[in-house]
Regions:
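Conserved nucleotide-sugar phosphate-binding/catalytic loop shared by glycosyltransferases and other
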Residues: 3-8, 27-79, 167-169, 233-235, ...
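Active-site-proximal region of nucleotide-activated glycan assembly enzymes
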Residues: 34, 40, 55, 115-181
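Donor-nucleotide binding loops and adjacent catalytic segments primarily
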Residues: 35-48, 180-185, 189-273, 306-310, ...
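An amphipathic, basic-hydrophobic alpha-helix
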Residues: 66-98
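Glycosyltransferases and closely related glycan-assembly transferases
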Residues: 86-100, 108-122, 135-139
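Acidic donor-binding loop of glycosyltransferase active sites
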Residues: 96-98, 264, 268-283, 290-291
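A short, well-ordered alpha-helix in the C-terminal region of glycosyltransferases
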Residues: 344-358
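C-terminal alpha-helical cap of glycosyltransferases
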Residues: 358-376
Length: 376
């Protein structure tokens, strides 16, 4: 079986593709799996896919710039034509039995050409609000899988052939297999350590980073607290300089990195998580049952991260801190309250797992893809 995975831009599109690929490889060790992403250096696929050991092909495509009247958007029609040609060459050479797109601008040309050539083509949309690539491809794709039931309504219903289904978000195997005690032992954490895990997205988030620098400096005064923060590659050098100018810079319990590559271990070991409220982050928190302080990105379409965060808040499964309040010290205040209340952390962890976890998502996605191949 030959499978071509495509999706990218941010880790939120790449990681679902990696999780689906890992599930297929687990069931079919001899499966040949390759990826297609954009040629942009900032595309996280160019980092994460080779690390996972898969061949990676690239096409010359990028997302639409904001504002819409930006002169750089004049190049998009040319790039759309060029990338479709490049995708066609990749498909012709690889000859896939199945193409799976996980959203982001990078998946459009490959999925579009796969559909045109009659290759079974499936899409997965992790967010409640579907992105432009999925919106453009939904009517032609053979299968559209979603994480939220409401996404099907936003896509116009189940489609003419009932080809839209809810399956949940796929998770990397580590999120399902690693226990808290095993992860903490692996990371050298004791029972007395209170581990705070913090990240603002694969590319970084300036205001979140600034707030965590202040938080880390404060937490140096709490002896049993350990913090790991991923600042993102784009903002890392600036934050490293700020970090080193505070008490956090000389405190071994406060750690700063650009990106977390062993997220399943870190998430499993955490007592408290600080993160954005993207769909994949919420799914990871739910599957591992973690208390979380969510800082929704205000820069996404229709405030979908705020909606994700408030869904958790309304169930008592999370705390929301809006980005515009960060300069007021709201993050430090909320974290301090949760550190002081293990009971509240425990309740939040139980509720997010009970209300939002979808532990069989990988199996449902795999079964759906195999049914698609057999039906064609």
């Amino acid at each position: 079986m030959r499978v071509l995975m495509t999706g990218g831009g941010t880790a939120g599109h790449v990681n679902p593709a990696l999780a689906i690929a890992a599930t297929i490889r687990e069931k079919h060790p001899d499966a040949e799996i390759a990826f297609v992403a954009s040629a942009l250096t900032r595309d996280k696929a160019n980092d994460l896919v080779p690390r996972a050991g898969y061949p990676l092909h690239t096409v010359h495509i990028r997302g639409m710039a904001r504002p819409l009247w930006s002169p750089s958007n004049l190049k998009l029609p040319f790039l759309m034509v060029k990338s479709r040609g490049e995708a066609g060459c990749i498909i012709d050479e690889f000859r896939p039995d199945l193409i799976v797109g996980t959203g982001g601008f990078a998946c459009w040309p490959t999925c579009r050409m796969g559909i045109k050539l009659g290759i079974p083509t499936a899409l997965h949309e992790s967010n409640a609000l579907p992105g432009q690539a999925v919106l453009k491809l939904k009517d032609k794709a053979d299968l559209v899988m979603v994480n939220f039931s409401e996404t099907i309504d936003r896509l116009g219903g189940t489609g003419k052939h009932g080809h839209m289904i809810r399956v949940g978000n796929p998770m990397m195997p580590g999120f399902r297999e690693i226990s808290r005690s095993e992860a903490r032992k692996r990371l050298g954490l004791t029972d007395d350590d209170l581990f705070v895990l913090s990240f603002g997205g694969s590319l970084g988030a300036e205001y979140v980073n600034d707030a965590v620098v202040k938080l880390a400096a404060e937490l140096t005064n709490t002896p049993n607290v350990t913090l790991l923060h991923a600042a993102g590659k784009r903002d890392y050098d600036r934050i490293r300089a700020d970090w080193d100018r505070t008490a956090a810079g000389t405190c071994g319990r406060m750690q700063l990195v650009d990106y977390i590559y062993d997220m399943p271990d870190r998430m499993a070991a955490a007592d408290l998580v600080i993160s954005r409220a993207g769909a994949m982050s919420v799914s990871e928190l739910a599957l591992t049952g973690k208390a979380a302080v969510l800082i929704p990105s205000p820069y996404v379409a229709e405030q979908h991260q705020l909606k994700n965060a408030m869904a958790l808040v309304n169930e008592g499964a999370g705390v929301c801190v809006e980005e515009h309040t960060l300069p007021e010290g709201t993050l430090t205040k909320q974290v301090a309250e949760l550190i002081a209340s293990p009971e509240k952390r425990a309740v939040m962890g139980e509720r997010i797992r009970e209300k939002f976890a979808c532990p069989d998502a990988n199996e449902r996605i795999y079964d759906s893809l195999m049914s698609l191949i057999k039906s064609k």
